[in-house]
Amino acid sequence: MARIGVENSLTDVQQALKQQGHEVVTLNSEQDAQGCDCCVVTGQDSNMMGIADASIKGSVITAHGLTTDDICQQVESRT
Protein backbone atom coordinates (compact mmCIF):
# COMPACT_ATOMS: atom_id res chain seq x y z
CA MET A 1 0.00 0.00 0.00
CA ALA A 2 0.93 3.64 -0.26
CA ARG A 3 2.81 5.84 2.19
CA ILE A 4 0.46 8.72 3.03
CA GLY A 5 1.36 11.89 4.92
CA VAL A 6 -1.56 13.26 6.94
CA GLU A 7 -1.67 16.55 8.82
CA ASN A 8 -1.67 16.07 12.59
CA SER A 9 -5.22 17.34 13.23
CA LEU A 10 -6.83 14.86 10.82
CA THR A 11 -6.85 11.90 13.20
CA ASP A 12 -10.02 10.35 11.75
CA VAL A 13 -8.41 10.31 8.30
CA GLN A 14 -5.21 8.81 9.73
CA GLN A 15 -7.19 5.98 11.35
CA ALA A 16 -9.27 5.29 8.23
CA LEU A 17 -6.20 5.10 5.99
CA LYS A 18 -4.42 2.79 8.45
CA GLN A 19 -7.47 0.50 8.41
CA GLN A 20 -7.17 0.36 4.63
CA GLY A 21 -3.59 -0.83 5.04
CA HIS A 22 -1.71 2.34 4.15
CA GLU A 23 1.42 3.47 5.95
CA VAL A 24 0.44 6.78 7.57
CA VAL A 25 3.00 9.45 8.46
CA THR A 26 2.00 12.41 10.63
CA LEU A 27 3.02 15.68 8.99
CA ASN A 28 4.72 17.92 11.52
CA SER A 29 7.29 19.48 9.20
CA GLU A 30 8.15 19.65 5.52
CA GLN A 31 10.66 16.81 5.93
CA ASP A 32 7.86 14.46 7.02
CA ALA A 33 6.31 14.75 3.55
CA GLN A 34 9.41 13.46 1.79
CA GLY A 35 8.99 9.90 0.59
CA CYS A 36 5.19 10.07 0.76
CA ASP A 37 3.11 8.98 -2.22
CA CYS A 38 0.39 11.45 -1.27
CA CYS A 39 -0.31 14.04 1.46
CA VAL A 40 -3.58 15.11 3.07
CA VAL A 41 -3.74 18.62 4.55
CA THR A 42 -6.57 20.56 6.20
CA GLY A 43 -6.50 23.37 3.70
CA GLN A 44 -6.55 25.99 6.45
CA ASP A 45 -3.15 27.08 5.23
CA SER A 46 -2.96 26.57 1.48
CA ASN A 47 0.81 26.21 1.65
CA MET A 48 1.10 24.22 4.88
CA MET A 49 4.77 23.85 5.72
CA GLY A 50 5.75 24.45 2.11
CA ILE A 51 4.26 21.15 0.96
CA ALA A 52 2.57 22.88 -1.98
CA ASP A 53 6.05 23.79 -3.24
CA ALA A 54 6.61 20.30 -4.66
CA SER A 55 8.28 18.95 -1.54
CA ILE A 56 6.77 15.61 -2.43
CA LYS A 57 6.47 13.75 -5.70
CA GLY A 58 2.85 12.74 -5.11
CA SER A 59 -0.47 14.51 -4.85
CA VAL A 60 -1.56 16.92 -2.14
CA ILE A 61 -5.20 16.47 -1.13
CA THR A 62 -6.96 19.33 0.64
CA ALA A 63 -9.40 17.92 3.19
CA HIS A 64 -11.47 21.10 3.54
CA GLY A 65 -15.12 20.30 2.82
CA LEU A 66 -14.52 16.57 2.31
CA THR A 67 -15.67 13.66 4.45
CA THR A 68 -13.25 11.00 5.63
CA ASP A 69 -14.68 8.64 3.00
CA ASP A 70 -14.19 11.26 0.26
CA ILE A 71 -10.56 11.68 1.28
CA CYS A 72 -9.93 7.93 1.34
CA GLN A 73 -11.43 7.62 -2.16
CA GLN A 74 -9.18 10.40 -3.44
CA VAL A 75 -6.14 8.71 -1.89
CA GLU A 76 -7.08 5.44 -3.60
CA SER A 77 -7.49 7.14 -6.97
CA ARG A 78 -4.18 9.03 -6.73
CA THR A 79 -1.89 6.29 -5.44
From Swiss-Prot:
Short name of any one Pfam family annotated for the protein: UPF0180
Read off the InterPro entries from this record: UPF0180
Q: What top-level branch of life does the organism fall under?
A: Bacteria
Q: Which HAMAP family match?
A: UPF0180
State the family named in the UniProt similarity comment for this chain: Belongs to the UPF0180 family.
Q: Identify this protein by name.
A: UPF0180 protein BCAH820_1484
* Organism in which the protein naturally occurs: Bacillus cereus (strain AH820)
